[in-house]
Swiss-Prot record:
<protein>
    <recommendedName>
        <fullName>Septin homolog spn1</fullName>
    </recommendedName>
</protein>
<keyword id="KW-0963">Cytoplasm</keyword>
<feature type="domain" description="Septin-type G">
    <location>
        <begin position="92"/>
        <end position="367"/>
    </location>
</feature>
<comment type="subunit">
    <text>Component of the septin complex composed of two copies of each spn1, spn2, spn3 and spn4.</text>
</comment>
<feature type="compositionally biased region" description="Polar residues">
    <location>
        <begin position="26"/>
        <end position="38"/>
    </location>
</feature>
<dbReference type="GO" id="GO:0032153">
    <property type="term" value="C:cell division site"/>
</dbReference>
<dbReference type="GO" id="GO:0060090">
    <property type="term" value="F:molecular adaptor activity"/>
</dbReference>
<dbReference type="GO" id="GO:0008104">
    <property type="term" value="P:protein localization"/>
</dbReference>
<dbReference type="GO" id="GO:0061640">
    <property type="term" value="P:cytoskeleton-dependent cytokinesis"/>
</dbReference>
<comment type="similarity">
    <text>Belongs to the TRAFAC class TrmE-Era-EngA-EngB-Septin-like GTPase superfamily. Septin GTPase family.</text>
</comment>
<feature type="binding site">
    <location>
        <begin position="244"/>
        <end position="252"/>
    </location>
    <ligand>
        <name>GTP</name>
    </ligand>
</feature>
<keyword id="KW-0498">Mitosis</keyword>
<dbReference type="GO" id="GO:0005634">
    <property type="term" value="C:nucleus"/>
</dbReference>
<keyword id="KW-0131">Cell cycle</keyword>
<feature type="region of interest" description="G4 motif">
    <location>
        <begin position="243"/>
        <end position="246"/>
    </location>
</feature>
<keyword id="KW-0547">Nucleotide-binding</keyword>
<feature type="compositionally biased region" description="Basic and acidic residues">
    <location>
        <begin position="13"/>
        <end position="24"/>
    </location>
</feature>
Length: 469
């Protein structure tokens, strides 16, 4: 069986017949001696002296700024952490929820069986094809089938969600609405579970990937398919595939892929592309580039074994002009789809689902009137904290200084008012005293004049008396 990438991006099963990013499993099963050699090799690349990182206290906080690299003098043991995580993942198992979305007869059940290399949906079961009778009602149903798959001791709980009736009617107006409602309902269910349980114990019901079947018309994507992708691309990881690609010639297939990608880019539809990380080795980068170049995947699915021109039994389809092999990358993009979906990027799909869920959760809580104080989640930087405290202290000092200036101004104003009042009182008293003095002076002058007149009259009387004598 092929290798599988399971929880947290950790490959747990490896097959020598397939080379993939799951080859990293060798490091998980290595012995202590090999681990010791890897640690010593990593240590030898560092310099002997300590390397303090330059202080960037005035810059934006970086959690790696305060790290000081030191040379290890011996084996510590943290190199075995991947082994511990591997044992935990194997013990708990994994779950993966995939939505297959397309019209009836697109080959959805065949693709699922081919993808897992077993009859998850037997030919007699019509869960992915639907049976509506003679006069079906224009209704899209949502069916979910769970199956537990064990490969080399690794348990995978796979939930396949199908949509019988999708796109099968003359009037397909809003045929995607039940699908969107189901996706959002699973988000709401997960949100409700979060309120009462730790995330590590929750059985994740969210849709991790949506395999969207595009009809092989040989032309561009249809208007209905475009509307469906526009309605779902913000809620789920869309993986577009061209169903029954063996019905198209090479030129028609290349033209169809080009037109689909052009429409997706023009309408800003977000589909899932394998992410590339700086730590990826050149082989992984090349594999990612090869996978991205195949999107949308041209799929040929079959559970039938036929004999090819070389006399080998292979899964495929026989035509009068030759044999089409399912697992041959020259005939079909199915191997790359399986590699991305299960072997290399299963955990990236779940991580991207977390991002889509967080966006939905935020929108849902905000619409309910619940807002989050983002300051609670700010990283604590000592230098930034000191700078913040210094700014608060300066603000406090400035406030105290302003208050003191206000009080001082009030005191000065009150003093000036009292001085002006005293000055006015003194001026009033001065005027009153001056008026009193002027009056007293006038009285004295009047009294003097009367005395002078009396004296003159007395002297005149005296002189008259002497004359008569």
């Amino acid at each position: 069986m092929a290798s599988m990438v399971l929880a947290d991006g950790m490959p747990t099963v490896k097959d020598d017949s397939t080379r993939s990013r799951g080859s990293d499993v060798d490091s998980f099963t290595s012995t202590d001696n090999v681990t010791q050699i890897n640690v010593e090799a990593a240590i030898s690349e560092n310099k002997n002296e300590e390397k303090p990182i330059q202080d960037n206290s005035e810059q934006e906080f970086n959690p790696h700024v305060s790290i000081i690299q030191r040379q290890l003098n011996g084996y510590v043991g943290f190199a075995s952490l991947p082994n511990q995580w591997h044992r935990r993942c194997v013990r708990q198992g994994f779950n993966f929820n995939v939505l297959v979305l397309g019209e009836s007869g697109s080959g959805k059940s065949t693709l699922v069986n081919t993808l897992l290399n077993r009859d998850v949906y037997p030919p007699t079961q019509k869960s992915l094809t639907g049976d509506f009778g003679v006069n079906p009602e224009p209704t899209v149903m949502i069916n979910s089938s769970a199956v537990e798959i064990v490969e080399n001791g690794i348990s995978l709980q796979l939930n396949v969600i199908d949509t019988p009736g999708f796109g099968d009617f003359i009037d397909n107006t809003d045929c995607w609405q039940p699908v969107l409602t189901d996706i959002e309902g699973r988000y709401d269910q997960y949100l409700e579970l979060e309120k009462h349980n730790p995330r590590s114990t929750i059985q994740d019901p969210r849709v991790h990937a949506c395999i969207f079947f595009i009809q092989p018309t040989g032309h561009a994507i249809s208007a209905m398919e475009l509307r469906v992708m526009l309605a779902l691309h913000e809620k789920v990881n869309i993986i577009p595939i061209i169903a029954k690609a063996d019905t198209l010639t090479d030129d028609e297939l290349n033209f169809t892929k080009e037109m689909i990608l052009r429409d997706i880019q023009y309408h800003n539809i977000r589909i899932f592309f394998p992410p590339t990380y700086e730590t990826d080795d050149p082989e992984s980068v090349a594999e990612n580039a090869d996978i991205m170049s195949r999107i949308p995947f041209a799929i040929i699915a079959s559970n039938t074994f036929v004999v090819n021109n070389e006399g080998k039994r292979v899964r495929g389809r026989r035509y009068p002009w030759g044999v089409v092999e399912v697992d041959n990358e020259e005939h079909s993009d199915f191997p790359k789809l399986r590699e991305m979906l299960i072997r290399t990027h299963l955990e990236e799909l779940k991580e991207q689902t977390n991002k889509l869920y967080e966006a939905y959760r935020t929108e849902r809580l905000l619409s309910s009137g619940i807002s989050q104080d983002h300051s609670v989640f700010r990283e604590v930087n000592p230098s930034a904290k000191l700078e913040e405290e210094r700014a608060l202290h300066e603000e406090k000092l400035m406030k105290m200084e302003a208050e003191m200036k206000t009080i001082f101004s009030q005191k000065v104003q009150e003093k000036e008012d009292r001085l002006k009042q005293s000055e006015n009182e003194l001026r009033t008293r001065h005027r009153e005293m001056k008026a009193a003095l002027e009056k007293q002076k006038a009285d004295l002058i009047d009294h003097k004049n009367r005395l002078m007149q009396a004296k003159a009259a007395a002297e005149n009387e005296k002189s008259k008396r002497k004359f008569f004598k």
